[in-house]
Each structure stands twice: as C-alpha cells, then as structure tokens.
Amino acid sequence: MAVPFRRTSKTVKRKRRTHFKLSVPGMVECPSCGEAKLAHRVCKACGTYKGKEVISK
C-alpha cells in the first residue's frame, strides 16, 4: 500500500481545507405571515407555498 513520502505540513493542510466550508442557507421572508423560511419551501409557521395553503393548521 502507498505511504506518503513527506508529512503534510499544517499550512498545506489548512490551505486545502479552506474550501471545505458550509454555505449559509438562503433565508427569505414569508409573504403571507412574515416569518423567516427557506427559499422554495413551504412555510412552517403558516403552511403556505406560492400564495396557496398547502398544509392546513
């Protein structure tokens, strides 16, 4: 089995990991109730999507 020829330095390791970051979710305001919700998803507070009630509460 292959073994690394040299030890990976802290700098090289950290530079490689700069791209392994989490992205912020796209939060928007619900047009019917004003709660914060994820874009392109049903609002958890009022149950509407694209102006129509999808989930009755």
Curated annotation (Swiss-Prot):
InterPro entries named among the record's database cross-references: Ribosomal_bL32, Ribosomal_bL32_bact, Ribosomal_zn-bd
GO biological process: translation
Protein name (record): Large ribosomal subunit protein bL32
Superkingdom, natural source: Bacteria
UniProt source species: Bacillus anthracis
Keywords, sorted A to Z: Ribonucleoprotein, Ribosomal protein
Any one Pfam family match given in the protein's UniProt record, by short name: Ribosomal_L32p
Cellular compartments per GO CC: large ribosomal subunit
The keyword Ribonucleoprotein belongs to this UniProt entry's keyword annotation: yes
PANTHER family per record: 50S RIBOSOMAL PROTEIN L32 (PTHR35534), LARGE RIBOSOMAL SUBUNIT PROTEIN BL32 (PTHR35534:SF2)
Family: Belongs to the bacterial ribosomal protein bL32 family.
GO molecular function: structural constituent of ribosome
Signal peptide from the UniProt entry: none
Ranges annotated as spanning the membrane: none
